[in-house]
């Protein structure tokens, strides 16, 4: 049987949003203000964020990810009948400080030790 000699891992690359960072944590922070629509807003926000990224790429109408994030939130809020500019601002600010998933710190420490 052939022995496989693997080199030590020197670099690892991750998709940050949705893999390391919980994209729904922004809406969770403002659950009290979003009320029963919190989950729907968060899910639609993420769905539109991905769809807008794909569509703009296909149409070669590139904008930065932050613009996509804002446009997607606007759609999600409007679709849920929410017209609150301060809530919009606070949700976008929360997106700058997304929580990581609980297992991420330990996993990254373990990978660092490899």
What are these regions (language model features)?
Residues 2-50:
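Active-site neighborhood of HAD-like aspartate-dependent phosphohydrolases
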Residues 4, 60-64, 99:
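A structural signal for alpha-helical segments
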Residues 22, 36, 82, 96-99:
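Residues in soluble alpha-helical coiled-coils and helical-bundle/repeat scaffolds
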Residues 33, 39, 53-89:
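A metal-dependent, Asp-based hydrolase signature
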Residues 50-54, 96:
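A broad detector of the eukaryotic-type serine/threonine protein kinase catalytic domain
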Residues 66-67, 85-114:
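Short, acidic loop-to-helix structural element flanking the phosphoryl-transfer center
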